[in-house]
């Protein structure tokens, strides 16, 4: 199962790499944290893409690097959960781009999060994050707070 950068994975001290990534991320060193992760396996590639998407949300820069990392993660995803997690990140990056006025990608955000909902089972660990992001899109892009509660 792929863990995104938002999962808090690695904060227990069990994995030195994840601890280093978490520490860098908590200091807003997203590119440095992403550079530690190998881009040749599905879970680390997805975590790398999530870190770079988070950087875009907070700094409004690095969009191309985040897109490249996301394409890599999508290409490496094999299982439905991995593909769903990659679609969730694609939706979140599209949401961030729309929110910051970089480009209107609201339709892409909704479509990607819908794909993710079809691929990620309700009991999966990544489902709560997906539902939260669907609520963000409903509330902030569609302007329908009631739909956010349903998501």
PLM regions with names:
Residues 92, 98, 115-118, 122-151:
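Conserved binding/catalytic microenvironments
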Residues 15, 19, 47-54, 89, ...:
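"A position-specific structural signal for the A-helix of alpha-solenoid helical repeats
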Residues 11, 43-46, 81-88, 125-127:
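Residue signature of alpha-solenoid helical repeat architecture, marking inter-repeat boundaries
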Residues 18-22, 34, 50, 74, ...:
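Amphipathic alpha-helical repeat scaffolds
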Residues 36-59:
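Short, charge-rich amphipathic alpha-helical segments embedded
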Residues 31-40, 62-78, 104-118, 145-151:
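Alpha-helical repeat scaffolds
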Residues 21-24, 53-68, 94-110, 138-149:
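Short coil/turn connectors between adjacent alpha-helices in alpha-solenoid helical repeat scaffolds
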Residues 1-31:
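Actinobacteria-biased recognition of intrinsically disordered, low-complexity terminal regions
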């Amino acid at each position: 199962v792929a863990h995104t950068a938002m999962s808090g994975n690695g904060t227990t001290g069990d994995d030195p790499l994840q601890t280093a990534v978490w520490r860098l991320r908590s200091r807003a060193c997203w590119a440095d944290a992403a550079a530690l992760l190998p881009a040749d396996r599905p879970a680390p590639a997805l975590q790398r893409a999530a870190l770079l998407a988070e950087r875009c949300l907070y700094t409004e820069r690095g969009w191309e690097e985040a897109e490249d990392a996301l394409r890599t993660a999508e290409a490496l995803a094999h299982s439905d959960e991995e593909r769903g997690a990659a679609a969730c990140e694609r939706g979140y990056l599209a949401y961030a781009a729309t929110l910051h006025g970089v480009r209107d990608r609201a339709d892409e955000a909704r479509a990607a999060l819908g794909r993710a909902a079809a691929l990620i089972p309700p009991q999966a660990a990544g489902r709560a994050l997906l539902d939260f992001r669907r609520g963000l899109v409903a509330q902030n892009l569609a302007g329908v707070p009631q739909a956010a509660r349903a998501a």
